Amino acid sequence: MPVRILVVDDDRAVRESLRRSLSFNGYSVELAQDGREALDLIASDRPDAVVLDVMMPRLDGLEVCRQLRSTGDDLPILVLTARDSVSERVAGLDAGADDYLPKPFALEELLARMRALLRRTTPDDGAGESAAMTFSDLSLDPVTREVTRGDRPISLTRTEFSLLEMLIANPRRVLTRSRILEEVWGFDFPTSGNALEVYVGYLRRKTEAEGEPRLIHTVRGVGYVLRETPP
């Protein structure tokens, strides 16, 4: 059975363009023109993932995310944000979106991000044998998907979890931007912009929320490294 994607956007041209592209690439596509219609469709005929615009009438994309997450629903969500609105991107992640894509975007990038998001959603057959990974007082369990810093639990989206998992699996090893983008997002497009920087900043905010020392460091011009002290 094809993977079912719900596309939610109040712009008819955007909806139809995404429907054609996703259908051409083997997905089954449903359309909604606002957040209220989207929630009704999700309740009646649940899709496998959602592409969700932020700015919409009646009920915006952020509120859709919040309502789904407040009920414990972990439906994979990719939000579409205004190109230059960093606050909108952060708000999307705060609301519980798994990933974001600024408009205008290349269709190839949206398809790559959707593949990566669905891949992160699919359980790994060998995951049951994985042991929890630790670095300093940071712990990540690939099976239960629980993350803690000391005794403090940390809630992460799928993308944040995948990024932290890559870092903690390569302690004290500098990882290049291109390698991280390829492994976590499945691509390294020039249009990716500052997606990686946004997610690193978000992980830092969550792992340092109670004043803990920084573990995720920038290696200027190269990438990032997980270590106790700055490089």
Curated annotation (Swiss-Prot):
Main location as per UniProt: cytoplasm
PTMs per UniProt: Phosphorylated and dephosphorylated by MprB.
GO CC terms of this entry: cytosol; protein-DNA complex
Entry-annotated residues carrying 4-aspartylphosphate: 48
Origin: domain of life: Bacteria
DNA-binding region: 130-228
Annotated Response regulatory domain residues: 4-118
InterPro entries xrefs: CheY-like_superfamily, OmpR/PhoB-type_DNA-bd, Sig_transdc_resp-reg_receiver, WalR-like, WH-like_DNA-bd_sf
Short name of one Pfam family: Response_reg
Alphabetic keyword roster: Cytoplasm, DNA-binding, Phosphoprotein, Stress response, Transcription, Transcription regulation, Two-component regulatory system, Virulence
Any one GO biological process: regulation of DNA-templated transcription
Cell compartment(s), UniProt: Cytoplasm
Single annotated GO MF: phosphorelay response regulator activity
Biological function: Member of the two-component regulatory system MprB/MprA which contributes to maintaining a balance among several systems involved in stress resistance and is required for establishment and maintenance of persistent infection in the host. Functions as a transcriptional regulator that recognizes a 19-bp nucleotide motif comprizing two loosely conserved 8-bp direct DNA-binding motif repeats separated by a 3-bp spacer region.
The protein, known as: Response regulator MprA
